[in-house]
Amino acid sequence: MNSKGLTLTIIFKAQSLNYGEGIGNISELKKLARGNGNVYTFASRQALRYDIARIGNKLYNWNLEVVDKEKGTIQFKDELNIKDSQEMDLFGYMKTSKKSAENEDGGSETRSAAVRLSHALSLEEYKSDMDFLTNKGLADRIDEFPNLANVEQHLSYYTYTVTVELA
């Protein structure tokens, strides 16, 4: 079989794209370290996929009412398919089923993604820039102490790749 596809590599300028769990009052960017010790920030492919679906819904009315927790885990609804959801069509899915009287084996129904994304990786090294935040202006109004936060910042060019299976 001779598969056809389209690959796009995109470079864009952005700041502080994707935060992880954080520690205390510090919001940490998602980062990875290379073998040479350099640290780079990234936006996960899941974050990119989420935003594509969000923008698809906002601009093109994509149906995002396609998930439930009927079987104990959050997944795409059993009765829906790619005709009902652009997201399911482009990014694929796995619907699991438990063993039951009707379904002795249990198992899963899957569709491979037609669109695949890489992480968006910064092209410039992260240098531990922090932004110190406070709500002092609000706290002063009621004679209270301000709340403090530290937010990691990184302005950089980023790159990611999109691969689309055409047939």
Predicted regions located by residue number:
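RNA-binding basic/glycine-rich loop and surface signature characteristic of RAMP-family CRISPR effectors
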Residues: 1-167
